[in-house]
Amino acid sequence: MKIFLDTANIDEIKDAIEYGLIDGVTTNPTLISREQKEGRGFSDIVKDILKTVDGPVSIEVVATDYQGMIDQATKIHNLGPNAVIKIPMTLAGLRAMKTLSEKHIPVNCTLVFNAIQATLAARNGAEYVSPFVGRLDDIGEDGMEIINQIRTIYNNYSFKTKILVASVRNPVHVLRSMIIGADVITMPYDVIKKLAMHPKTDEGLSKFLSDWKKVSPDGSFPI
């Protein structure tokens, strides 16, 4: 199981790398728009991320037609060997996935909301499929159930496409993804940090440090 960071913020990426917490990065047009500054455009942001991350980086096309997707995907692919092309789950997107996979250009099929869509993406050669569990929760569905369904279907038919759980909102999403057997989980940095936290851990550490002052009143480590 791998963990990806869902961000275009280079500082968050560098922090997460320093802690040894991530294996890759996912971005989208919204995340990139938040990092855009005067004199620093899309290409600059993406190139920085690709150079910083020693792992796959998903970058999304914004074209909605087949040829536009292929043209943009080719440009993104040429930015770095670790670039993965995010293609939306549409009919045009499925056609683009097939073409790109035949050229051995890795694709992350995004905006997936049911297991049939995920199956079509796998049939057309997607390297990753990204079901959006949090957004399904938002409309009253159990977003994690789609992960269970996809895992079963992929196992049934020996699809090699990796399940990349997206729209992750909390550690419960992460835990359930691990139990089901998702291949990758991508999440914002605040969720990643929460994975290492537990109130009983904080409580226990505070108690140990308090007791240590009985051994070393100034808190030093006398060795």
Curated annotation (Swiss-Prot):
The biological pathway it contributes to is: Carbohydrate degradation; pentose phosphate pathway; D-glyceraldehyde 3-phosphate and beta-D-fructose 6-phosphate from D-ribose 5-phosphate and D-xylulose 5-phosphate (non-oxidative stage): step 2/3
Q: Where are the transmembrane segments?
A: none
Catalysed reaction, written as an equation:
D-sedoheptulose 7-phosphate + D-glyceraldehyde 3-phosphate = D-erythrose 4-phosphate + beta-D-fructose 6-phosphate
GO MF terms here are: aldehyde-lyase activity; transaldolase activity
GO CC field: cytoplasm
Main site of residence? cytoplasm
Q: Which GO terms describe its biological process?
A: carbohydrate metabolic process; pentose-phosphate shunt
Q: Name the catalytic site residues.
A: 86 (schiff-base intermediate with substrate)
- Its Enzyme Commission number? 2.2.1.2
What is the top EC class of this enzyme, as a single word? transferase
Pfam families registered for this protein in UniProt: TAL_FSA
Q: Which InterPro entries match?
A: Aldolase_TIM (IPR013785), TAL/FSA (IPR001585), Transaldolase_3B (IPR022999), Transaldolase_3B/F6P_aldolase (IPR004731), Transaldolase_AS (IPR018225), TSA/FSA_arc/bac (IPR033919)
The reply to whether Cytoplasm figures as a keyword in the UniProt entry is: yes
Which SUPFAM superfamilies does this entry report, sorted A to Z? Aldolase
Keywords, alphabetical: Cytoplasm, Pentose shunt, Schiff base, Transferase
Indicate where this protein resides in the cell: Cytoplasm
UniProt-listed NCBIfam families? fsa_talC_mipB (TIGR00875)
Spell out the family assignment given in the record's similarity comment. Belongs to the transaldolase family. Type 3B subfamily.
As for what it does, the entry says: Transaldolase is important for the balance of metabolites in the pentose-phosphate pathway.
Protein name according to UniProt: Probable transaldolase
